[in-house]
Amino acid sequence: MKVILATHNQGKIREFQKRFSEIGWEVIPISDIADIPEPEETGTTFREMCIRDSFRENALQKARYYAEAVNLPVLSDDSGIIADVLGNEPGVYSARYAGVHGNDEANNQKLVEVLHPYRGEARRGHYMCVIAVVWPDGREITAEGRCNGIIRDFYKGTGGFGYDPLFYLPEFGKTMAELSMEEKNKISHRGKAVDAMLKKLKEAGI
């Protein structure tokens, strides 16, 4: 089955293609299909809705938009990092925390600066991911995943993307960026969301 992936993020493309190939899905980036303007993400802020619903709203919005545009099933996700002490920032704004969408270096540096006054338990946070699959006939399935850790004030590791070099996993003694893709897919927020989605798809007979 062919499914369109609503992202231009190369890291996400690699992760989704690897995992969904397990059920025979051919995951094709939207950029390989058509030059379609990206939808504006209008997920409500955390102060107005719970974290999960904000991510879910954005994931569904993207998937619905592209499913209508290309008339094919679309896979989308919305994810981000949450620093508990900051009142759930960066959250749905993770990819553009420093003002420019997709600038990992700038986003990481801003988070380091904002968290600079905090130490120890105050630096706890988590990654959150919500995945959505939307079909042109209106069917929709969503799944979520979460990964807890500590947001460090220095970088370590060269793998992954986003905030992975800052996100330390005490149980592994590594940052997310130090994990292999196989390790990351087992324990990351996105890996857990994919696991939940694959289970739901199987239960639905898809």
Give the residues covered by each predicted segment.
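Anionic-ligand binding patches
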Residues: 2-4, 10-206
